[in-house]
């Protein structure tokens, strides 16, 4: 038996967020939507569940240290009772280059992690399993599987990155970093180049909606 995992990664250096403080708060009124709040060095999510509220501060360790970020996180929740102590989660934004290596297939968080967005992660898990079954049934090569999954992961990375880059906020070094990446032309490029000709997490219409929402001029 041979169990080999390829640990070669594709680094995603433009993505700055690499930490998150998370905790549970006592439930008050239930909102029917998730709140995403821009913060000076990242963003905060607030999700109301049946018996608690989950919240977290996603930030970049390049621009704020863990102690200061914890103090800010607590201050934003000062009017709410914490029912769990804040917990620090760390990661390095990356994509695994070859998730299928010999007789090992990496699926889930080990396959890549960019940003703590649960719906994206769930989709990538389902997609990876579905694609693996198709490849096995068609006797496709691991290289074909890796190429397809890697492309979808990179598409996910690119789409998330554009949400940071297209914002109008530039009042802190964190947001200025993204502002200086000059992303707008890439929005329509993703829409115009080879439309609907390859597997993507975000279809062309989604890129078009992104361009329209942020009022990005067409090339």
Task: Briefly describe each language-model feature range.
Residues 1-80, 129:
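Predominantly flavin-linked oxidoreductase catalytic cores and closely associated redox partners
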Residues 50, 59-167:
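FAD/FMN-dependent oxidoreductases across multiple families
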Residues 134-219:
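Long, low-complexity C-terminal extensions of enzymes
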Residues 21, 32-34, 44, 86, ...:
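Generic preference for hydrophobic/aromatic residues in regular secondary structure cores
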């Amino acid at each position: 038996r041979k169990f080999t995992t390829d640990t070669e990664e594709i680094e995603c250096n433009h993505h700055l967020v690499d930490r998150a403080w998370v905790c549970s708060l006592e439930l008050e009124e239930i909102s029917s939507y998730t709140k995403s709040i821009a913060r000076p060095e990242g963003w905060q999510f607030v999700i109301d569940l049946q018996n608690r509220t989950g919240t977290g501060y996603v930030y970049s360790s390049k621009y704020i240290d863990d102690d200061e970020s914890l103090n800010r996180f607590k201050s934003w929740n000062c009017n709410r009772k914490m029912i769990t102590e804040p917990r620090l989660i760390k990661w390095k934004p990356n994509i695994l280059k070859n998730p299928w290596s010999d007789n090992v297939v990496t699926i889930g968080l080990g396959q890549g992690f960019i940003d703590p967005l649960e719906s994206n992660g769930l989709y990538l898990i389902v997609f990876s399993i579905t694609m693996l079954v198709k490849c096995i049934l068609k006797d496709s090569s691991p290289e074909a599987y890796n190429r397809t999954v890697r492309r979808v992961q990179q598409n996910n990375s690119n789409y998330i990155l554009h949400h940071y880059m297209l914002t109008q906020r530039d009042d802190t070094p964190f947001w200025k970093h993204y502002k200086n990446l000059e992303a707008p032309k890439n929005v329509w490029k993703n829409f115009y180049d080879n439309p609907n000709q390859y597997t993507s997490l975000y279809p062309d219409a989604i890129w078009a909606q992104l361009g329209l929402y942020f009022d990005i001029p067409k090339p």
